[in-house]
């Protein structure tokens, strides 16, 4: 294989009858068929639940490089479920993924996922455990007739881009230093506690000097 990208140029040392140790990939097409059959079998087994599994939350990708994009996460946090009014044990039984390790670090993410849960709950057709004795919250007989298995992801997460109209760049925007501003904001956030502590100590020393 030809070297790709900025990696080290390899010097392969072929000894010990290397032709018998070549990694082959002849099972690839059969493995593809096997995966497809497994997906179809699972879809039949869990019908009429969605074939792609439970609903996932909207999360932001980590690091500065990717945090402008959103994607589907692992599971909803316990706080999101509490605000949406869904018990964590009930959530898993009605096709909602739960991740107790996740923490909400912003109000926006919390509100977005709570709204997502409420929308999902409004669209959900819930089958009664006993058809003869439906409980509160179960769907009506008319709604049950409309139920079909969803094949794609449940409420897929999409990145929405808002196009801006072309306009003249202002002088203020030309003089604005984006990178320096971000670095300064990060430095201020990092040093906030240390600066507050130093200011408090300086104030205490001034009080002692006045005495």
Curated annotation (Swiss-Prot):
N6-acetyllysine PTM sites in chain numbering: 16, 177
GO biological process assignments: blastocyst development; bone development; cytoplasmic translation; translation
Keywords: Acetylation, Cytoplasm, Disease variant, Dwarfism, Isopeptide bond, Phosphoprotein, Ribonucleoprotein, Ribosomal protein, Ubl conjugation
Domain of life per record: Eukaryota
Residue(s) of cross-link: Glycyl lysine isopeptide (Lys-Gly) (interchain with G-Cter in SUMO1): 174
Protein's cellular compartments: Cytoplasm
Entry's Gene Ontology molecular function annotations: RNA binding; structural constituent of ribosome
Tissue-by-tissue expression: Higher levels of expression in benign breast lesions than in carcinomas.
Segments forming a coiled coil: none
Keyword Ribosomal protein: yes
GO CC annotation, single: cytosol
Cross-linked residues, Glycyl lysine isopeptide (Lys-Gly) (interchain with G-Cter in SUMO2): 123, 145, 174, 177
Modified residues (Phosphoserine): 52, 77, 106
Its job: Component of the ribosome, a large ribonucleoprotein complex responsible for the synthesis of proteins in the cell. The small ribosomal subunit (SSU) binds messenger RNAs (mRNAs) and translates the encoded message by selecting cognate aminoacyl-transfer RNA (tRNA) molecules. The large subunit (LSU) contains the ribosomal catalytic site termed the peptidyl transferase center (PTC), which catalyzes the formation of peptide bonds, thereby polymerizing the amino acids delivered by tRNAs into a polypeptide chain.
Family: Belongs to the eukaryotic ribosomal protein eL13 family.
Oligomer and partners: Component of the 60S large ribosomal subunit (LSU).
Disease connection: Spondyloepimetaphyseal dysplasia, Isidor-Toutain type: An autosomal dominant bone disease characterized by early postnatal growth deficiency, severe short stature, genu varum, platyspondyly and severe epiphyseal and metaphyseal changes in the lower limbs.
The name this protein goes by in its record: Large ribosomal subunit protein eL13
Protein's organism: Homo sapiens (Human)
Lineage summary: Eukaryota, Metazoa, Chordata, Craniata, Vertebrata
